[in-house]
A protein has these predicted regions:
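Short, conserved beta-strand element in jelly-roll/cupin
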Residues: 146, 153-171
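Residues that flank catalytic or metal-binding motifs in active/ligand-binding sites
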Residues: 69, 97-98, 158, 172-174
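Short, solvent-exposed loop/turn segments at secondary-structure junctions
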Residues: 20-22, 102-104, 108, 150, ...
Length: 222
């Protein structure tokens, strides 16, 4: 644990591999998989979106349209290693502000009329285009580097995000991409000032274009 805490302090990122009960993880994953027809059928029609556009409150919240809250996640939340790590980093009185399922939407699911729009305007969160009854999970289709404090702009930066992969994730399955040590700059305005190098392990990031610094990119696959 000491090594994990040191890594987190140094890089802002830490990975725990093979920590959870795989059977319990897959049981939840399979139940989610069978919950609905994961296809173009979860999307609203173009006519409906134009007539009734929705840009806010289209994602699950705490106690609000949240499929993840229907599951017993004690094997995650009460895992001794996880609890110890969170106690050491956040303090003994930490609380879970929000837990939700995040779904990576493949191109095959996106209706043809919507593909051009989401590509042109780099729309990552598809909640506003999803039928209301299916908005109990968050739907992402690629997303720029960002800090999760963007969802709580008036909050203190005393929070962390924990991602749990319920199934194996490879580089073609929208894995989490992080920038190691970028936390040392603290909260910065989105969209962030980043000069990416597509075929390089590093990118340039800073609070202004005059103060860009070199940071290492990391892709989290399992």
């Amino acid at each position: 644990m000491k090594e994990k805490l040191q890594t987190f302090k140094k890089t802002g990122v830490v990975v725990f591999e093979n920590l959870l009960d795989k059977n319990k993880s897959l049981k939840i994953f399979n139940k989610v998989l069978k919950n609905r027809n994961w296809s173009k059928k979860i999307f609203r029609t173009k006519k409906e979106v134009i007539k009734y556009p929705q840009y806010t409150k289209t994602n699950p919240g705490k106690g609000i349209c949240n499929y993840a809250e229907e599951f017993n996640l004690d094997f995650i939340e009460k895992n001794k290693t996880i609890q110890t790590f969170l106690n050491k980093t956040l303090g003994d009185e930490y609380e879970i502000v929000l837990k939700k399922f995040v779904v990576a939407v493949p191109d095959a699911w996106v209706p043809n009329w919507l593909k051009e729009k989401v590509n042109k305007f780099l729309i990552a969160n598809l909640g506003g285009y999803i039928k209301k009854k299916f908005r109990d999970v968050t739907y992402f289709r690629g997303i720029d580097y960002h800090q999760d404090i963007i969802d709580n702009p008036n909050a203190k930066p005393d929070m962390l995000t924990m991602y749990v992969y319920l199934n194996d994730v490879d580089k073609n399955m929208s894995p989490l991409n992080v920038i190691e040590k970028s936390h040392i700059l603290g909260p910065t305005v989105f969209p962030h000032i980043i000069k990416d190098n597509i075929n390089n392990e590093f990118l340039m990031y800073g609070k202004s274009r005059k103060t860009l610094r070199k940071f290492k990119k990391k892709q989290l696959i399992s």
